[in-house]
């Protein structure tokens, strides 16, 4: 089958593609920014650069698409996200109108008919909009998705691993029905072309109905940790959002959205989909165990932290590829090196649990200050310890370019600051070049740069020396 994928660079999309390729399908992947396209060069995978928020009649989809997956969500988008999601759905229908599309598979959230959060109500409205297309709609509604790198999993992990005693809001007693990411992908991949599922919606769920408190307790049990959890009715949604924001790696916008959704009970409607598709979901305990098995093997295929909703990043990567030369303040350093590959390995391992090789306390302090002002801080870390792709999050940086062939890494700062900042590493002819570039925004931007200049001297000097000297010692 020829299958169209939307949400290609998202958490689900990046994981679904290998499942569909293994099943022998040909894929046409829609991406907003071609620079962020995953699986480039893979057989049976092609890409179309398209922004579903804007309809462009000049963009044409292949007319021989058999099935499509609608995986676009704006969980923490600012502004009127409901309107944005409906615009995406309406534009999608316009794009596929000339296409001989037989089936659309939409991944939504479990609906509580008595009470809906804004985001789940938006998902429902999108489903109703998509029902009006020239295809058969299959909707899968999932609750909490448990997998390495998923927002819910990483937030629970942060809470359990960082806090021996938790003073928590009362919504921790809300019931939900989690499902493993592997089972979600199995349902999605097996749905393609199955006419029994045409024009139907199904809840997909694991066998356990749990409160969020029970999920935390089971998670702690898997990790071999003893945790005390105390729930208080006095924590307001705003206070709960700040609690999640400061303790976990989530952004405040996403924390607010999650808190609103977590107050609503989402328990699945029983159905026979499991028997129909021969997918038998594992329980929550095993889903957590499976997630850590992937983490321990450095096999995380995608993470919510790499999505643009984890920060305030706006626009395409190409907008930031050209580092400005005029009207900027710079810190440029270079060092002679003997072993280019070894130094490159160290550059490619920067951030996350590795840290920045020098002055990590100062880096952490800058990250803490960034969090206080509503920024991302250092808590996102990185998805993989040694692999980097354009578009990945790396602490409070966004990877703009990661080209091992040309031996260049370019990072763009997502910190809160009065200006824009780039950090570039480049190796050429046995020399390492390190460029820190800041484009100030007005007088405050210039004052900011000069106020941190003494720290920059130690940090950037120490960083380039550590990248080179540690390698040279090992070579010697």
Indicate where each model-derived feature is located.
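Conserved glycine-rich Rossmann-like NAD(P)H-binding loop of the short-chain dehydrogenase/reductase
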Residues: 25-32
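A conserved amphipathic terminal alpha-helix motif
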Residues: 440-442, 446-476
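N-terminal Rossmann NAD(P)H-binding glycine-rich loop of SDR-like oxidoreductase domains
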Residues: 3-25
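Oxidoreductase cofactor-interface core, primarily capturing Rossmann-like NAD(P)-dependent enzymes
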Residues: 16, 23, 114-225, 242, ...
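Mid/C-terminal beta-alpha module of Rossmann-like enzyme folds, strongest
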Residues: 2, 194-254, 265-331
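Hydrophobic-ligand binding "helix-grip"
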Residues: 381-429, 437-441, 468
């Amino acid at each position: 089958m020829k299958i169209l994928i939307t949400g290609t660079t998202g958490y689900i999309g990046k994981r679904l593609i290998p499942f569909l390729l293994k099943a022998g399908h040909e894929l046409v992947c829609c991406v907003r920014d071609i620079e962020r396209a995953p699986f480039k060069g893979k057989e049976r995978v092609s890409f179309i650069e398209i922004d579903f928020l804007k309809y462009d009649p000049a963009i044409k989809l292949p007319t021989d698409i058999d099935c499509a997956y609608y995986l676009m969500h704006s969980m923490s988008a600012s502004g009127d996200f409901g309107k944005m999601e409906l615009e995406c759905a309406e534009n999608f229908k316009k794009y596929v109108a000339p296409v001989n599309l037989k089936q659309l598979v939409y991944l939504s959230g479990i609906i509580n008919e008595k009470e809906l959060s804004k985001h789940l109500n938006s998902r429902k409205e999108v489903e109703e909009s998509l029902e009006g297309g020239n295809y058969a709609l299959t909707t899968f509604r999932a609750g909490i998705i448990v997998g390495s790198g998923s927002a819910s999993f990483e937030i629970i992990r942060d809470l359990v691993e960082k806090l021996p005693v938790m003073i928590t809001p009362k919504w921790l007693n809300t019931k939900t029905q989690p499902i493993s990411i592997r089972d979600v992908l199995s349902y999605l991949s097996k749905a393609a072309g199955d006419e029994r599922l045409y024009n139907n919606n199904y809840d997909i769920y694991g066998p356990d109905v749990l409160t969020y408190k029970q999920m935390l307790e089971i998670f702690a049990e898997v990790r071999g940790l003893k945790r005390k959890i105390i729930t208080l009715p006095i924590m307001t949604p705003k206070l709960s959002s700040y609690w999640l924001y400061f303790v976990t790696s989530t952004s405040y916008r996403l924390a607010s959205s999650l808190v609103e959704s977590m107050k609503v009970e989402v328990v699945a409607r029983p159905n026979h989909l499991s028997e129909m598709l021969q997918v038998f979901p594992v329980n929550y305990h095993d889903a957590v165990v499976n997630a850590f098995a992937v983490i321990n093997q450095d096999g995380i295929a995608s993470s919510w932290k790499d999505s643009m909703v984890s920060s305030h990043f706006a626009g395409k990567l190409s907008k930031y590829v050209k580092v400005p030369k005029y009207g900027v303040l710079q810190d440029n350093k270079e060092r002679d090196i003997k072993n280019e590959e070894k130094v490159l390995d160290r550059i490619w391992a920067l951030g996350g649990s590795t840290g920045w090789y020098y002055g990590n306390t100062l880096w952490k302090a800058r990250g803490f200050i960034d969090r206080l002002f509503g920024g991302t801080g250092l808590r996102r870390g990185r998805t993989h310890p040694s692999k980097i792709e354009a578009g990945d999050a790396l602490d409070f940086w966004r990877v703009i370019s990661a080209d091992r062939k040309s031996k260049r890494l370019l990072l763009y700062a997502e910190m809160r600051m009065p200006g824009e900042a780039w950090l570039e590493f480049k190796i050429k002819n046995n020399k390492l070049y390190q460029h820190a570039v800041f484009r100030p925004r007005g007088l405050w931007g210039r004052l900011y740069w000069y106020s941190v200049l003494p720290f920059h001297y130690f940090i950037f000097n120490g960083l380039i020396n550590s990248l080179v000297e540690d390698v040279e010692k090992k070579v010697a």
